[in-house]
């Protein structure tokens, strides 16, 4: 990206610091609109790099030089700047961040030049009314609700169904296509079960460790690997429909199949599909591993299917499968 910080760069009139859990892109967006400059124009003035940082997923691809410009321009410590990036989840949510590739749990934006082709950024309409900015958590695959307002997160405009593309909008926090304010988006209540499930995930992410049944995860990455593996066997594969049906019959939920996606990753599902999926995941993983074993056995999800497409499954998951689902027919 940027080779050096421009030596003549002086602080901007905008000196706002990142808000709690704010994404880098959101912080930059607020700066641009506060100074009444189009985001792409401000990006060109600030970075003068090829390719322009804003034509990529800047929350995942911004390097130290990009951060230094923002740090100097807003008089913000570099440590605060780094916390706005998705890479700050490294060793907590995933093992290694991939700046120019797919990272586990990070929802893809499908950026092509200035266009976003995938609903990879979510929002809570009540948060947009109370404290309008985009949170890092809203890019995480298992995040489907706002635990503050107890609402389901949206990944498209409620009026026209366009994806969220902040840099293309003429004003902050409105739809770039129909200009509807995101604060006026549909407010869909989340179930008590899903609010509690997400609170647990957020606590694990913040604390860096987890307990699942009798298994203790000293590093939260190991827990989130297990969570993702259970989500994938519920969402994809020849036995996934039977597994979902079993879970719903035993403990409730919605067995509707998620829309197919070429990536076969839970992060690539839309917000409705992920909400239904993680509702099933939460029901399946209670009383671990008992419910999972009962459901998998009933669905004939034996070891060969449970380990499919994963040469290095999480240890806790692999141990349960090997002990209780060893049949191969």
Predicted regions and their residues:
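Basic, alpha-helical nucleic-acid-binding regions used in initiation and control of genome expression
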Residues: 1-329
């Amino acid at each position: 990206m940027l080779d050096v910080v421009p030596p003549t760069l002086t602080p901007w009139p905008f000196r706002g610091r990142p808000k709690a859990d704010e994404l880098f892109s959101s912080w930059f967006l607020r700066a641009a609109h506060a100074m009444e400059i189009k985001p792409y124009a401000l990006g060109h003035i600030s970075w003068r790099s090829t390719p322009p940082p804003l034509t990529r997923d800047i929350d995942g691809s911004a390097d130290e030089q990009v951060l230094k410009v923002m740090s100097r321009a807003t008089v913000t410590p570099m440590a605060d700047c780094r916390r706005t990036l998705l890479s700050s989840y490294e060793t907590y949510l995933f093992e290694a961040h991939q700046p120019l590739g797919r990272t586990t749990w990070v929802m893809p934006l499908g950026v092509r030049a200035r266009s976003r082709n995938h609903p990879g950024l979510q929002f809570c309409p009540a948060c947009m009314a109370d404290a309008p900015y985009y949170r890092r958590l809203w890019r995480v695959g298992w995040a489907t609700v706002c635990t503050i307002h107890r609402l389901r997160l949206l990944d498209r405009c409620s009026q026209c169904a366009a994806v969220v593309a902040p840099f293309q909008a003429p004003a902050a926090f409105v739809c770039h296509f129909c200009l509807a304010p995101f604060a006026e988006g549909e407010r869909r209540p989340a179930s008590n079960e899903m609010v509690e499930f997400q609170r647990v995930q957020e606590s694990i992410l913040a604390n860096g460790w987890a307990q699942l049944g009798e298994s203790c995860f000293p590093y939260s990455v190991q827990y989130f690997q297990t969570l993702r593996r259970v989500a994938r066997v519920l969402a994809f594969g020849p036995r996934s429909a039977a597994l979902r049906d079993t879970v719903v019959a035993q403990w409730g939920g919605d067995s509707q199949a998620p829309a197919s996606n070429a990536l076969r990753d839970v992060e690539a599902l839309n917000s409705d599909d992920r909400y239904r999926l993680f509702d099933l995941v939460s029901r399946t993983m209670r009383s671990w591993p008992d419910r999972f074993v009962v459901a998998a056995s009933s669905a004939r999800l034996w070891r060969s299917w449970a380990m499919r497409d994963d040469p290095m499954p999480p240890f806790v998951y692999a141990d349960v499968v090997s002990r209780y689902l060893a049949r191969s027919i």
